Structures are given as structure tokens and as C-alpha cells.
Amino acid sequence: MTQILTPLVLVLFLSASLVAEDPWKRHTIDNSSRGADGVRVADVNGDGHPDFTTGWEEGGKVRVYLNPGPEKAKELWPAVTVGNVKSPEDAVFADLDGDGAVDVVSSCEGSTQTVFVHWAPQNADDYLKPDKWETAAFPATKKKTRWMFCLPMDVDGKNGIDLVLGSKQPNAVVGWLESPSDPRKLGEWKWHPLYEAGWIMSLMKVDLTGDGQDDVLLTDRKGPTRGLVLLEHPGQDNATGEWLTHRLGGEEHEVMFLDHRKVPAPGWEIVVSTKDNNLLGFSRSDKPQQWTQVAIPAAKNTGTMKSVRWIDVDLDGRLDLIYSCENANGKLSGLVWLESTGDPTNWKRHEVSGPEGIKFDLLQLLDLDHDGDLDVVTCEERTNLGVIWYENPTR
């Protein structure tokens, strides 16, 4: 069943001020392959530092990076290739078998169209040894669709972590893989389709309905189903049943990535980037089945929007916005941040990347140098800057 949550649409016509600034310092984590496509984060060795995994789409590699700590974070990071698969679009950490060794799941598009697990070695000393990793496919996903994104999530409250998956055409879908009693038996993972899609960009778990159960918030980029969508979890006892589909808005845009956070000012709960270069802010209205949608045009001299995040860049207590871009050709910037002035119709543009790089991806916000402000981690895949981070100059 689909429930339509009609958005009240407001368009804020504004132009962020353009200021000539130096870009932030860029540090390379890895540029050893081709087509780095998204960074996902977890502390896999329990040292308190965030580690990363990335799929290199053109290079056909899935790699893991162990954080060397703030003193060495500006150098190349210790890394391991955990598997070689064609066209990996996404890679994410998940301890699927619960043995304490954090595995990696890769989602592949192209002609591969399969989801793989890369089993981590149980001995922590072997984590950076590529020959100690084992790669295997989930049979239920083989040659089904172009898999784009994976969200590890305990959907049904049993047998550990399940996998929520999203794809693009052909056969675009969102669904979940149910973990069996022995997660190592990949043939026993069961597929449950939830939603017919066009092109899935984001999958995020968030309790948007307030019932204590994480739902799945997604952006669907293409086709008649495009927009911002909530799949309402029916409860762990009914997880294999029907999930209500709530359409929150954005159908008139090619929506890209999203971020969710309750922000006192300007009052948005969800922010979404769009290919047509608008940031969409969503807030709950007085009516329970209506959301207010606000559109903010992109800053000048940037590519087309890809990922967006809330971040207090300058530590003034107000949440700013940062976004990455594709198609940042020539003198266009691929990363900029918009300073909050306290007025939601007035955002001030600031530089992050400068003109170097063309196609950037998912943004992760972490204090890698431990100086008290948030740095920005991302990938760039056209000029092969690779897996990189930008050092926040605030401190």
C-alpha cells in the first residue's frame, strides 16, 4: 500500500555570495586504482579511529583502509584489497557472521549485477593480508539487477545483521536479504522485495514514524517512482510482510543523496541534493500527512549536486550545509559549503575543493586530525584523486 504524504512546496530564490577563497588542504588516503566510488565508515579494529572501505568501480577492487591515527592521517593509509569484483558501486562494513571480525559487502552493477561478501580473517593480525580474505556471492542476488547501495540492518531481530539493498534498472528494486541461522551459508539468505524503483541513490535507517522501530528512508532518482520515499517498518514480527510506502516529496526533481537530522533552524528534518541543482529541505507541517518542501538553488560555479550533509564547519553553533558535485569541469568547484547566517533564505558560499577534481561522491564528516573541527572525506573518480579528505581550516 502506498500512502501519499503531499508536500507543501516553497521555493526560496536566493544566491549564495561568491567569495574568492583558497581551497581546503587535500590529503590522499589512496589513489592506487581507478574509479573510487563512495566511502563507508566503521571502527573495524576497536582502536577508536574510523576506518574506511571503498569500491573502485573501474579498477574492479574493493579496498579497506585502517586509520593510522591523527599523527599519520595526512599520509597514505595502510590498506588491503579484500576482493576483486567487476563494477563495484558500493562497499560497506558489516560483521555478518558475528565472529567479531568485520566483513565487507560489495554491491555491483555493470554486467556483474551481484552482491558479494568479503569474509574478514578471524585473526586481527591478518586483517591487512589480502590472501586471508575470502570473497563469495549471495546466490539470491546473482544477475538480478544493477545493485547500487547496501544498508546493513537487523530487520527481523534474529540471526544478526540483514542487508537492505537498492538497485537501478533493469529490475530496479529495494528489498532485504534475510540472514539465516548460519550466515556463512549464503545459499540460505532469503530475498524479500519491498519496493519497485527506478534508480536508488540513498538508503538510510531512521525512525521517522516514532514507533521505536527503524524505517528505511530512500531517494529514488529516476522514472515514475522518483522522489523521497519512506518505507515504514511493520515491526520485527511482521518484517517479511508489507511495508507501507510513504511518498514525502521531490517527485519533480532528480533526487540524489540525503541527510537526516532535526535542525532547529531552519527547521528541516531532511535535506536532499538534486541533479538539477536544488537543495530540498523537508520539515513536518501541522498536518500529519503533509510535509513542507523548500528548494534552495545551488551556489554559483559548481558542478551538479551529488551528496549533501549538515555540518557546523566554523563551530559557531549553527549547522551549515556542505555538498559535493559531479560534472565539476573546468573552473567549477566539486565541493563547497554554505554558511548558515540564521536566515534560511540567506546562505553564504565558501570554497572546499577548488577546481581540482570532476566527479565527487558520498560525504563523510569526521575529525581525522583531532583538532576539534570536522574534516570531509570523499572520493573523486574522474581525475583519479581517489579516496581523499579535506582538512577543515577552522582550527
Describe the residue ranges of each PLM region.
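N-terminal secretory signal peptides that target proteins for export/translocation
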Residues: 1-2
